[in-house]
Regions:
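Bimodal "functional hotspot" detector
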Residues: 1-144
Length: 144
């Protein structure tokens, strides 16, 4: 069984850290999402890391023309503090824009466009895309 390295982003002191995990190849978007939701790696690579994502995340992800549309339920945004909301969005955007064929992400809640916080704290307008660069200011370092 072949596996491939996948970059997943987790939180350390309100900053994001890239970790690499092996996922069965070819890694699908749903496999990447499941790995991200499962939480940081065990052992030294995951030491001090956490996830802002809920352990149960109802999300559908469709990729078209380089844009990943992540459609979730209202609970995804309402159950998180404002800081964790920004970090959870950053985890998703940074992780998925590292995948081949994805350059931007757009968020919807119950199929309606929503504003999401960017890394600097400002809001991306409903229906506008966000990218890796919108959250790169939150990245602290590369972990193994």
């Amino acid at each position: 069984m072949l596996s491939e390295p996948v970059e997943l982003y987790y939180i350390s002191d309100d900053r994001l850290v890239a970790t690499t995990q092996s996922i069965v190849s070819p890694a699908t978007i749903s496999q990447v999402l499941a790995a991200l939701i499962a939480g940081p790696p065990t052992g030294n690579n995951g030491l001090g890391l956490r996830s802002a994502l809920p352990t149960v995340l109802n999300a559908e992800i469709d990729i078209s023309k380089g844009v990943a549309q992540i459609n979730t339920t209202a609970e995804f945004l309402t159950e998180l503090s404002p800081i964790d909301q920004r970090l959870a969005i950053a985890q998703l955007v940074l992780t998925f824009t590292r995948r081949p064929g994805v350059g931007q992400v757009i968020f919807t809640v119950d199929d309606q466009n929503v504003a999401v916080p960017r890394g600097r704290g400002d809001l991306a307008k409903p229906g506008s895309t966000v990218s890796f660069d919108d959250y790169s200011s939150l990245i602290v370092a590369l972990a193994g």
